[in-house]
Amino acid sequence: CIRDRAPVIMHYGSPEQKATLLPRILSGEDRWCQGYSEPGSGSDLASLKLRAVRDGDDYVLNGSKIWTTHAHFANRMFCLVRTSTEGRPQTGITFLLLEMKTPGITVSPIHTLAGEHEFNQVFFDDVRVPVSGRLGEENDGWTVAKHLLTFERSGPVSYTHLTLPTSALGEIS
């Protein structure tokens, strides 16, 4: 979280998002999961279909994400959603930050052949996310995601273990 989400929130976040989310990331109070991959999309991230329709001060989400690591532990998700189908696929993507306890979100475990549970499919059924949860501009989430990936894919791999706060270790065991 500190390595990838914090820099992106610092760069694209509103003053309110920075004031609320950055201290929670630093303290480990929030556990984040990533809502990128979708069923049937393979490695083509821009082909995502999780639909987000603007309704007043909210986006209404319908669809699903898959291979979502630790969604069953997370209380927040950073998520790419489809807000427009016009133009190139990358131009109709919006980056949202959302609460995993929002009504309409269902986390379904994916068990490995060894019986382990690390991955999940996450379903969104009429999930309302406030517009204030948007990071960056509507339909410019591709830019935000690329920025995040520069941090996520850089640096020593051992730092990735810092993204799960110590408070979650009891739940894992």
Task: Put a short name on every predicted segment.
Residues 50-53:
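A structural signal for short hydrophobic beta-strand segments in well-ordered beta-sheet cores
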Residues 14, 34, 61-63, 96, ...:
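Buried hydrophobic positions in well-ordered alpha/beta secondary-structure cores of metabolic enzymes
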Residues 1-4, 160-166:
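Conserved small/polar residues in nucleotide/adenosyl-binding loops
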Residues 28-36:
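A short, Trp-centered hydrophobic/proline-enriched beta-strand micro-motif
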Residues 3-19, 23-29, 69-76, 151:
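Internal helix-loop-helix
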Residues 62-108:
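A short core secondary-structure module
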Residues 171-173:
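Hydrophobic alpha-helical segments, chiefly the membrane-spanning helices
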Residues 108, 113, 120-162:
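A glycine-rich, basic-preceded beta-loop-alpha segment at the flavin cofactor/substrate interface
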